[in-house]
């Protein structure tokens, strides 16, 4: 009968584990780099948001906010909301900026997007029904991390959307008082 607690076997197992983990992390890093998911600077007209975040956010706003007259009346309503989100992030802490960019990066990277959202293609090309289903799946997930991701994502999108004047008329808000 072999001794499974020998030091020789433990070292071998440790080396195998280390080699396997190194290969896995190296492959994930290479995939992220080749897929354009490596950290990059802000988009040309943005202070925090990256170029890869913009189409993703443009697709998520209608799914998060729901049907809104401003989406059909004002062709640049979503762009204005994205700009508002960028301004809000600009004045938040570096930690918050980093966490938001990590969340958006995770949703942009094909390796993580499919298993986490159920949408295997590009999120910017997904139908509103697919995006709503993904958001509901996160909201009702048994995993706390996905529920927190849902809550954070929706709070950010709602905060940015309802801070823009084009959203006010539909909810009966006349705007801030003139002083």
Model-derived regions: residue spans:
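N-terminal secretory signal peptides and thylakoid transit peptides that target proteins
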Residues: 3-25
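Glycine-rich, flexible loop/turn motifs
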Residues: 45, 119, 167-169
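Short, functional C-terminal segments
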Residues: 2, 163-179
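C-terminal segment of N-terminal export signals and the immediately downstream linker at the start
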Residues: 7-8, 28-70
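A short, amphipathic alpha-helical segment
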Residues: 2-3, 158
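Short, well-ordered alpha-helical packing segments
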Residues: 18-19, 31, 135
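Flexible, low-complexity segments enriched for small/polar residues
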Residues: 50, 54-163
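Short linear motifs in low-complexity, proline-biased tails and propeptides
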Residues: 23-28, 163-165
């Amino acid at each position: 009968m072999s001794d499974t607690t020998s030091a020789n076997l433990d070292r071998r197992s440790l080396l195998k584990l280390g080699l396997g983990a190194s290969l896995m992390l190296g492959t994930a890093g290479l995939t992220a780099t080749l897929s354009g998911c490596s950290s990059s600077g802000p988009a040309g007209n943005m202070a925090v948001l990256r170029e890869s975040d913009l189409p993703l956010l443009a697709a998520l706003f209608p799914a998060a906010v729901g049907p809104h007259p401003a989406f059909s009346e004002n062709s640049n309503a979503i762009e204005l909301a994205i700009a508002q989100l960028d301004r809000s992030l600009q004045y938040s802490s570096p930690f918050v900026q980093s966490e938001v960019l990590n969340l958006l990066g995770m949703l942009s990277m094909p390796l993580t997007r499919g298993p986490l959202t159920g949408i295997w293609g590009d999120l910017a090309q997904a139908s509103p029904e697919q995006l709503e289903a993904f958001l509901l799946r996160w909201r009702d997930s048994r995993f706390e991390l996905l529920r927190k991701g849902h809550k954070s994502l929706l709070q950010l999108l709602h905060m940015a959307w309802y801070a823009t004047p084009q959203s006010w008329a539909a909810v009966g808000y006349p705007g801030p008082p003139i002083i």
